[in-house]
Structures are given as structure tokens and as C-alpha cells.
Design a protein with these regions (language model features):
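Predominantly cytoplasmic-facing regulatory/coupling regions of multi-pass membrane proteins
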Residues: 1-82, 140-141, 145-260, 288, ...
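Re-entrant/interfacial helical elements at transmembrane boundaries that shape
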Residues: 96-106, 266-283
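Transmembrane helix-loop junction
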Residues: 66, 89, 107, 238-239, ...
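Hydrophobic alpha-helical membrane segments of integral membrane proteins
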Residues: 100-104, 116-119, 131, 220, ...
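Transmembrane alpha-helix interface/packing and boundary motifs in multi-pass membrane proteins
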Residues: 85-93, 252-273
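Short intracellular "coupling" helices and adjacent cytoplasmic loop segments at the cytosolic face
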Residues: 82-99, 205
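Membrane-interface alpha-helices at helix entry/exit sites of multi-pass transporters
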Residues: 74-79, 93, 97-98, 108-124, ...
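Membrane-embedded alpha-helical segments of transport systems
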Residues: 83, 87-91, 115-139, 294-309
Length: 329
């Protein structure tokens, strides 16, 4: 029952945001005209780069697995990643993409706990890298290198507060001394319910405590993924006629990435469009709402198309009886 209610909530949020944006923010005809004039050559190049970002993400996952003594062929991880993306984008009300990745890996290795840990650490390191990039780029606003009104300057403090909280959380998960201190805080009545979740997260990340270089390398790969997706957004903006400076993409793209994580939706639909309009049109004032939402819709299509191979791979796997490929150690 709870799952059905969550599904209905996601559908309602996605449809509600789309209805709001196309009723009060943009004209549907204008958006369709902008999309209809897209340069398909640049769109194809952006799609190729996006596949590259996905491949980089799988490389980071393999790096983390090796630190746990798990050897999985990169080709197999690509498959699990694409299958996860497919289920996450098209069947999100039923199952999340990270759950699919972890399930596939667990079948491959017969090490369910380690598989779950690798997926969790992969996600945490990626979020930390994106938060760090967002915080670093907001300095350009604070220093006046990127012009912004009071709303954008206020957002700088929000980003830095969120980044600071993220760093403290990550440190509290890794450090045994901080862990002991935090566990004292969880004795308070208001925080006691969150104590089991914190302990599970901390125990999951402890195997990497003695491997800081691996975490640093994973952090670097996450930044590389962000750089590639920045280039993807710039190419799509150019495909729609240009006018969006790269520095604004570097500023806002890592922030946009958090929107579908914080707000439940169906594959990010509606939430992504609202985030693009908020950052690029409202806070940045660098493009119109029509252009921002057109860009977000084109990016949404790109995300959906790039995950389609996962459906094909899953179907082929089912025809073979769902047997995982490749050796594992």
C-alpha cells in the first residue's frame, strides 16, 4: 500500500509540475518551435558524450569494487549500469536504478552485502563531488565574476550550507571518533529514530576508511563525469540556437542534478524542467523560460534514449535465462 501511494505521489508531482510550467511559465507552441529547430548533428554528438559519461561512471564503480576484492569485468558493469538506468527511467515507480544495479551485481558475485556497499559508496562519492563542484562555482558569484541578483547571491549561502553539511556527514560516516560523537547525539529523543540508518551507512563505508586514495580517485572520476555532462548541456543549448554561456552551465548543472534526488518524480520528469527554469531563467536570468524548459526537455529525451540499451540488454539476459556473464572473484 505504501509503495502504491509513493507511486501516485511521484506521478502527481511530475504531472503537476509539467501542467504548472506549461500553464503559467511557457507557451507550448514556442517550446515546440524551439525544439523543432534543433541541430540534430549536435544532438547526436551530445548523445555520444552522454554515453561516455555513463561509461565513466561504470569505471568508478569498478574501482570501488576492486577495493573490496571484487573483480568484475567492465563490460558486465556497463550492462548492469544500463539496466539500472532503464528501470530507473521507465519503471521508477516500481524499482530504483541503484537497486537494479546492486541486484545484478549480487547475482554476479554472490556477495550481496558487498554489492550493496559498493553501490552506496558510489552514490555518496558522486553526490559529494557534485556538491563540491556546486560550492566551488558559487564562489564566482560571490566574487562577482558571474553577475547575479539578490536571489542568486542568497542561493550561494544555501549551497555552501548544504555542502558543509554533506562534508560533515561524510566525515562522520568515516571517522570513528566523530562516529562516537554523533551516536551520542542520536540518543536524543528527536534523533533516535534515525540512529539505525546512520549506523548502517557508517558500517557500509568503513571498509573504505583505510583506502583514502581510492575514494579520492572515485571523487576525481565523478568530477570528470560532471565535466562531460556540462559539455552535453552546452552542446544541446547550441543545438537549440545557443546563447547559454558555458560558465552558467558549470554553475547550475551540479545543482540541477540534486533536484530529482530531493523531489520524488517519475524519472525526473517535471522536476528537471522546473529546476532548469529556476536556475537558468529565474536565478541566472541568462535565458528565457521557453529556452530553459526546451533545453531541459531535450536533455530529458537524451536521458531516456541513452537508457534504452538497458532494456535490450535486460531482455537478452531474460532470453538466456537471466544468467550473469563473466567471471567474478
Amino acid at each position: 500500500m505504501r509503495g502504491k501511494l509513493l507511486t501516485l505521489l511521484k506521478v502527481a508531482i511530475s504531472l503537476g509540475l509539467i501542467a504548472y510550467l506549461f500553464t503559467f511559465k511557457v507557451d507550448l507552441g514556442t517550446v515546440l518551435r524551439v525544439l523543432g529547430q534543433a541541430d540534430l548533428g549536435r544532438v547526436a554528438l551530445a548523445l555520444g558524450l552522454y554515453f561516455g559519461a555513463i561509461a565513466l561512471g561504470a569505471t568508478k564503480w569498478q574501482l570501488l569494487l576492486r577495493q573490496q576484492g571484487i573483480q568484475v569485468p567492465l563490460v558486465a558493469l556497463w550492462r548492469y549500469t544500463f539496466e539500472g538506468l532503464f528501470f530507473g527511467n521507465f519503471l521508477l515507480p516500481l524499482v530504483a536504478s541503484d537497486v537494479v544495479r546492486g541486484y545484478d551485481l549480487a547475482r554476479h558475485t554472490d556477495r550481496a552485502a558487498e554489492a550493496a556497499i559498493s553501490v552506496l559508496v558510489d552514490k555518496l562519492v558522486g553526490l559529494l563531488a557534485f556538491a563540491a563542484a556546486a560550492a566551488a562555482m558559487t564562489l564566482t558569484v560571490a566574487l562577482g565574476w558571474i553577475p547575479g541578483g539578490p536571489a542568486l547571491r542568497g542561493a550561494v549561502w544555501v549551497v555552501w550550507a548544504a555542502f558543509g553539511g554533506f562534508v560533515v556527514l561524510f566525515a562522520a560516516l568515516l571517522s570513528r571518533r566523530l562516529r562516537a560523537l554523533v551516536e551520542r547525539l542520536f540518543r536524543l529523543p528527536l534523533l533516535s529514530r534515525a540512529a539505525p540508518l546512520y549506523r548502517r551507512l557508517s558500517e557500509a563505508i568503513q571498509p573504505f576508511r583505510e583506502r583514502p586514495l581510492a575514494l579520492l580517485q572515485a571523487f576525481g572520476i565523478s568530477l570528470a563525469v560532471l565535466l562531460v555532462t556540462n559539455a552535453v548541456n552546452w552542446l544541446l543549448a547550441e543545438a537549440l540556437g545557443g546563447g547559454l554561456p558555458m560558465r552558467y552551465i558549470f554553475l547550475f548543472n551540479p545543482m540541477v542534478a540534486f533536484a530529482p534526488i530531493l523531489i520524488p518524480s517519475v524519472g525526473g520528469l517535471g522536476v528537471n524542467q522546473g529546476a532548469y527554469d529556476l536556475f537558468y531563467a529565474s536565478l541566472g536570468g541568462v535565458v528565457s523560460s521557453d529556452f530553459a524548459i526546451s533545453l531541459s526537455l531535450l536533455m530529458q529525451v537524451l536521458i531516456y534514449v541513452s537508457s534504452l540499451p538497458g532494456g535490450v540488454l535486460w531482455w537478452r539476459g531474460q532470453r538466456r535465462g537471466g544468467k550473469p556473464e563473466g567471471p567474478a572473484a
